[in-house]
Amino acid sequence: MTSKFKFFTDRKHFFLGVIVGLSIVLALGIGQVFANPYNYKVVKVSDGDTVQFEAPFMQQYLGLKPVLALRVLGVDTPEKGGRAQCPQEDAKAQAASAFTKDAVAKAKVIQFEIKDHDKFGGRVLGDVIIDGQRLSELLIKNGYARAYFGEKKQSWCN
């Protein structure tokens, strides 16, 4: 007997179809889930431009851990630790992290504006709105970040 759905009889194509289908469903559903801006509790400031927050919908809708990391879109902050190119960059990264931690700690209202997902996976891209001010703008204004939109990054080792 010949199947109408011959494409799905091959195991590889079947799983590909399932993945594509789930991707479409998630893409359509995430627009509903990520209505902007959202108020969630900050769990951790990873570095100057990455903040982790409680995201209960991750577990409720997707069955994933309820914490999501947001990288601030449109900025480049220095790298810290082993990713720093020089001691000066690491020091600047520590200062950027301290600035973000302090801003979050003093905030009365923190909102997350989610725009996209990170190409490296596991994070979303957007902005953190702290008492009505965008973290991206605060980081740049106070010298802890540079505007960045995909061009070649400038060195922090000057």
Which residue stretches match the model-derived regions?
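Small beta-barrel nucleic-acid-binding modules, primarily SNase/OB-fold domains
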Residues: 2-158
